[in-house]
Design a protein with these regions (language model features):
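Structural motif
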Residues: 80-81
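Hydrophobic structural segments
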Residues: 71, 75-77, 90, 96
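Short Gly/Thr/Asp-enriched flexible loops that form oxyanion-binding sites at enzyme active sites
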Residues: 84-107
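N-terminal glycine-rich anion-binding loop in soluble enzyme alpha/beta folds
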Residues: 2-76
């Protein structure tokens, strides 16, 4: 059997981690249906899930960027890749900020 790739998954909210409510989709502190879906990937990947926070990305600010960067910096070692889930409203801003905050991170 091939070695499983080790993936660090950091969830921050957004639609991917939302749950339906009578008022529409809402952030879910447990990542919505995402954790259950991860079980399907267990044959090929060893996934470490860190639910960092659960907010609408329209509310993402530099304070959250720092928290995401800190989480990646403190936890990336020993992993083959890092995945950060994020809503689409401010994803480009967060991605840009993290690029500058995490220079030399040699992981996809």
């Amino acid at each position: 059997m091939d070695k499983k790739m080790k993936i660090l998954l950091i969830t921050t909210g957004g639609t991917i981690a939302a749950v339906p409510t009578p008022e529409g989709l809402a952030p879910d502190a447990h990542g919505g249906a995402l954790p259950a879906m991860l079980g399907m990937l267990g044959d090929r990947y060893e996934i470490r899930h860190i639910p960092l926070f659960s907010i609408d990305s329209a509310n993402m600010q530099p304070e959250e960027w720092r928290e995401i960067a800190r989480c990646v910096y403190e936890n990336a070692e020993g992993h083959d890749g890092v995945v950060i889930t994020h809503g689409t409203d401010t994803m480009a801003y967060t991605a840009s900020a993290l690029t500058f905050m995490l220079p030399g991170l040699n992981l996809p």
